[in-house]
Swiss-Prot record:
Keywords associated with the record: Cell adhesion, Endoplasmic reticulum, Glycoprotein, Signal
Name of the encoding gene: CERCAM
Name listed for the protein in its UniProt record: Probable inactive glycosyltransferase 25 family member 3
Region (Disordered) location: 576-595
Localization, UniProt: Endoplasmic reticulum lumen
Length: 595
């Protein structure tokens, strides 16, 4: 299918001013750049994509927009039109090329299915954008897929500075997927190399020559050899797979044009593509997870204020309450957590955590808090900290509220949660399955550190649930009314130990018999999601790691001194975390990498 000829003026907004020239300035003007925007069914990511383009630190008078959209079944066209109407006058030139019909390709099985006709049409569009940039006299053209979010506002300047003919900013994703290949076979297929992971993980930093970049990359239109580059038609000798990214890689190779990827900076994010049989909802869920990852790892994504977005409809997912324990003096954590819940459309309620730094012996005596005789941290040998007392009291207050209000089931989050992909959908499905099996339960871990996962048995009829063994952390769990009653009935305040040590005692899985002897009955029915649905945002040793329980005063020390116990095994990134789909946990390349 050939790209359609230029549309009538009513369909094509072509605001072509003369190429900006320097006028009375001491320094030469910045190079001119065309931003090529090709959007299809991008409603879920366009607001953040366009917001990132708006924030690029680059004069609008030196930028042109080339925008095309086609074959949409969502609101992509209206979003782009709204955005161009709001910001288009700020740019040196704007090309607007929408196609309302058809809404799909004849042979496609769904909107994420790549047919030969779709590949060809995309190549023709990219070629049209490239031709426009050359005719307009631009110095560069930036291709950036609409689910690639350039959170670094210096991206254009940083890519232009080294003077490379074709260069990509290395983008991060939810997995090890990125926008470059380190190896390619003689037949044009992906080849694994020893360089990929050190590059992707930034164990080696710089700008490196690679055989292919895709999704987001900058092409210098002044560099030697780039005048021969083309997306369509393919090179006369081309025999590799019919795919736009491979066609362009071959064109670079044939023209002798070096291709580089740069990873010294964090430039932004790209969404892991869904499989061909999946739909737009799967892609939307993936992108929400990418937003959440950016909130943790930074910098965050910001949506354009010039685009109307579908309204959010937060819910409690069928629970009576969704509690978020958060210290008032950690507003950044609270804001991140509430933003994460909002993005997932989860309605949460903040519970101000008890601040261990505000506790003293007098307050704890008034509350009836006393140390469990003989308690020591299992790894550092230290005693209970005031931070751990505050943490326990925070959870305890929620258990009390559950019983007082008669809440049938609740979710409890701490404010350092990293959510796994499709957290909301997977939790809702898990609870539906638990209800269908009529499983009696008191507590279900959603995130924890397993000590002996090989000893945990899958619950019959519930493949995503295991009987919980000895575990650390209380960052995310589901609690029933019956479970809250059991926890309170054990009167734990007068024989306190960390809350994540207390819970395994209550379901009789703690290895310390002396500790267990202080509590009876130990009949809490505890389970865990498998794979886990949440993990900590950071671990001991990470640059952003911070703990108000590990960096604290001993429980009976009123001097105010803070001691950091950072070597506890509990806070380290352990190999026994049962995670799936999270950042850095999947080593399998995406199918498109195996072309």
């Amino acid at each position: 299918m050939r790209a359609a000829p230029a549309a009538p003026l009513l369909q094509l907004l072509l605001l072509l001013g003369p190429r900006p020239e320097a006028a009375g300035v001491a320094e030469p003007p910045l190079p001119t750049v065309v931003l090529a925007i090709l959007a299809r069914n991008a409603e879920h990511s366009l607001p953040h994509y366009l917001g990132a383009l708006e924030r690029l630190d680059y004069p609008r008078a030196r930028l042109a927009l080339w925008c095309a959209t086609d074959h949409n079944v969502d609101n992509t066209t209206a979003m782009l039109r709204e955005w161009l109407a709001a910001v288009g006058d700020n740019y040196a030139a704007v090309v607007w090329r929408p196609e309302g019909e058809p809404r799909s390709y004849p042979d496609e099985e769904g909107p994420k299915h790549w047919t030969k006709e779709r590949h060809q049409f995309l190549m023709e569009l990219k070629q049209e954008a490239l031709t426009f940039a050359r005719d307009w006299g631009a110095d560069y053209i930036l291709f950036a897929d609409t689910d690639n979010i350039l959170t670094n506002n210096q991206t254009l300047r940083l890519l232009i500075e080294p003077g490379l003919p074709v260069v990509a900013p290395m983008l991060d994703s939810q997995t090890y997927y990125s926008n470059f290949w380190c190896g390619i076979t003689p037949q044009g297929y992906y080849r694994r190399t020893a360089d990929y992971f050190p590059t992707k993980n930034r164990q080696r930093r710089g700008c490196f020559r690679v055989p292919m970049v895709h999704s987001t990359f900058l092409v210098s239109l002044r560099a030697e050899g780039t005048g021969q580059l083309a997306f369509y038609p393919p090179h006369p000798n081309y025999t590799w797979p019919f795919d736009d990214i491979i066609v362009f890689a071959y064109a670079c190779q044939a023209a002798g044009v070096a291709v580089h990827v740069c990873n010294e900076q964090r430039y932004g994010y790209l969404n892991v593509p869904v499989k061909s049989h999946q739909g737009l909802e799967d892609e939307r869920v993936n992108f929400i997870h990418l937003i959440l990852e950016a909130l943790v790892d930074g910098p965050p994504m910001w949506a354009s204020a010039h685009v109307s977005r579908p309204p959010k409809r937060p819910s409690k997912m069928g629970f009576d309450e969704v509690f978020v324990i958060s210290l008032a003096r950690r507003p950044d954590r609270r804001e991140r957590m509430l933003t994460s819940l909002w993005e997932m459309e989860i309605s949460g309620r903040v519970v101000d955590a008890v601040d261990g730094r505000m506790l003293n012996s007098s307050v704890m005596r008034t509350l009836g808090v006393d140390l469990l005789p003989g308690y020591q941290d299992p790894y550092s040998g230290r005693t209970l900290t005031k931070g751990e007392v505050g943490c326990f009291l925070s959870h305890y207050s929620i258990w009390e509220e559950v019983v007082t209000r008669g809440l049938a089931q609740v979710v409890v989050f701490e404010d350092d949660v990293r959510f796994e992909s499709n957290f909301k959908g997977r939790l809702e499905q898990l609870m539906e399955e638990v209800e269908a099996e009529k499983l009696p339960w008191d507590l279900i871990y959603l995130g924890r550190k397993q000590v002996n996962p090989e000893e945990e048995a899958v619950v019959e009829g519930l493949p995503h649930l295991v009987a919980a063994g000895y575990s650390y952390w209380t960052l995310a769990y589901v609690l029933s009314l019956a479970g809250a009653r059991k926890l309170l009935a054990s009167q734990p305040l007068r024989r306190m130990l960390p809350v994540d040590e207390f819970l395994p005692i209550m379901f009789d899985q703690h290895p310390n018999e002396q500790y267990k002897a202080h509590f009876w009955p130990r009949d809490l029915q505890a389970f865990s999601a498998r794979p886990l649905l949440a993990a900590p945002t950071h671990y001991a040793g990470d640059s952003e790691w911070l703990s108000d329980t590990e960096t604290s005063s001993p429980w009976d020390d009123d001097s105010g001194r803070l001691i950091s116990w950072t070597g506890s095994y509990k806070t380290l990134r352990g190999p026994r975390l049962d995670l799936a789909g999270g950042s850095g946990h999947s080593l399998r390349p995406h199918p498109r990498d195996e072309l």
